[in-house]
Amino acid sequence: MEIKAEEISEIIRKQIKEYGTEVAVAETGTIISIGDGIARIHGLDKAMAGELLEFPGGITGMVLNLEEDNVGAAILGEFSEIKEGDSVKLTGKIVEVPVGPALIGRVVDAIGNPIDGLGPINTDTFGKVEVKAPGIVKRKSVHQPMQTGLKAIDSMVPIGRGQRELIIGDRQTGKTAVAIDTIINQKGGDVVCIYVAIGQKRSTVAQVVSKLKEHGAMDYTIVVAATASEPAPLQFIAPYTGVTMGEFFRDSGKHALIIYDDLSKQAVAYRQLSLLLRRPPGREAYPGDVFYLHSRLLERACKVSDDCGAGSLTALPVIETQAGDVSAYIPTNVISITDGQIYLESDLFYSGVRPAINVGLSVSRVGGSAQVKAMKQVAGTLRLALAQYREMAAFAQFGSDLDKATQMQLARGARLVEILKQPQYRPIPNEKQVLIIFAANNGFVDEYPIGSLGRYETELYAFFDSRKATLLGELRDKKAIDDAMKGEIIASLEEFKKEFTA
């Protein structure tokens, strides 16, 4: 083999030309104590609050406390392999998570890593977990409806796109059911849904995902799961991860819906973190900034002005109360941050009224301006009628001889309560909700026994689908009832009345 000196010298010359000295400088510190997902690190003098840290084994952390001689950090992942004396690097970055359409249909953990076994997520877009909420100029008042498909909510506690509506109630009152039905109702629409599970059992999350798949809802849904077995830092950061993913769609001019299930568990995780970081405890041992924890999260859900893309992010946070105590610390905080609440009551739930919405305590502060006009026309008196019925029913327990008018009002009220009941996973389109409430308000169901009203409703929908499809379509498109349409609806209901036998 012949060695050519020119060739070798040419290669050496080329390599010298391309040679560049790049020295990577990273500030490192040493772990002085670790446990319960919290590490104290000495030597990170240039660390910034909220900065991302790199621990051995590719695990990341987040700076939470800046103290005189050390830094307190939350470890975002499994910390059993990390030990005292290990070195930690500053990254100079803030915690980021993957965002974009590639996440739709996937189940990810609290920092955006896929956990559904469907391979990696192909996206180059990342979003910062902690960003400032849009300012006043960038916002617009809520004016478009966000249909839940639940008669009791769409008629009396309407939700608009960009609203924050709290779902509050004791355990096992159907809070998650309301949220899941709302997701299922977005099928065929233009809303991307994000379901954030915080501190729930893995079996529960798996059940939710399988229900969403069964109803074809995973085609437009992202699930972020920080289950009960995850360390507290991951349960604390999961809602911020979810809202970052939602903001991508909001800022792209699209519409998104995010459900935090539930923020009570996030507050508990944050309390645990704060106490371990030795921050001074306040009321109920929560840290002083627990209000800010939720306010900065929920302020990121809004309706964006037309100049900024006209997108929206609607938030449905869930709060679990203890024995119906709405005046506890976290419930009062979140009630004051949100634009209204849907209050679910265990007494109603056990008496068979499902969804178990207490109409008297539930309110939507901004949704009224977003409600479909047809629904506003038929449901305007509904809340008052139900309130009067509840009051009369309470008095009627004491007296037996009631006058005719009172008896009629009680009968009508009982039928309204029955009409507003709805089975789970069966959201109803808005035009059909309008029909059944119109029928109940105008006395079309008064003569039937309460037990047959479920069948009346099912058969009424089938009748309109098969024989009055044009009228139904007109109601769907116009979204309002004029005199001519009112006459048509009454005539159709009279026609159905002749055919229906209780």
From Swiss-Prot:
GO terms for cellular component: plasma membrane; proton-transporting ATP synthase complex. Produces ATP from ADP in the presence of a proton gradient across the membrane. The alpha chain is a regulatory subunit. It catalyses: ATP + H2O + 4 H(+)(in) = ADP + phosphate + 5 H(+)(out). PROSITE patterns: ATPASE_ALPHA_BETA (PS00152). F-type ATPases have 2 components, CF(1) - the catalytic core - and CF(0) - the membrane proton channel. CF(1) has five subunits: alpha(3), beta(3), gamma(1), delta(1), epsilon(1). CF(0) has three main subunits: a(1), b(2) and c(9-12). The alpha and beta chains form an alternating ring which encloses part of the gamma chain. CF(1) is attached to CF(0) by a central stalk formed by the gamma and epsilon chains, while a peripheral stalk is formed by the delta and b chains. It is a peripheral membrane protein. It comes from Geobacter sp. (strain M21). It is found in: Cell inner membrane. Keywords: ATP synthesis, ATP-binding, Cell inner membrane, Cell membrane, CF(1), Hydrogen ion transport, Ion transport, Membrane, Nucleotide-binding, Translocase, Transport. The record marks S362 as: Required for activity. Its EC number is 7.1.2.2. Belongs to the ATPase alpha/beta chains family. This is ATP synthase subunit alpha. GO terms for molecular function: ADP binding; ATP binding; proton-transporting ATP synthase activity, rotational mechanism. ATP binds at G169, D170, R171, Q172, T173, G174, K175, T176. InterPro entries: ATP_synth_asu-like_sf, ATP_synth_asu_C, ATP_synth_asu_C_sf, ATP_synth_F1_a_nt-bd_dom, ATP_synth_F1_asu, ATPase_a/bsu_AS, ATPase_F1/V1/A1_a/bsu_N, ATPase_F1/V1/A1_a/bsu_N_sf.
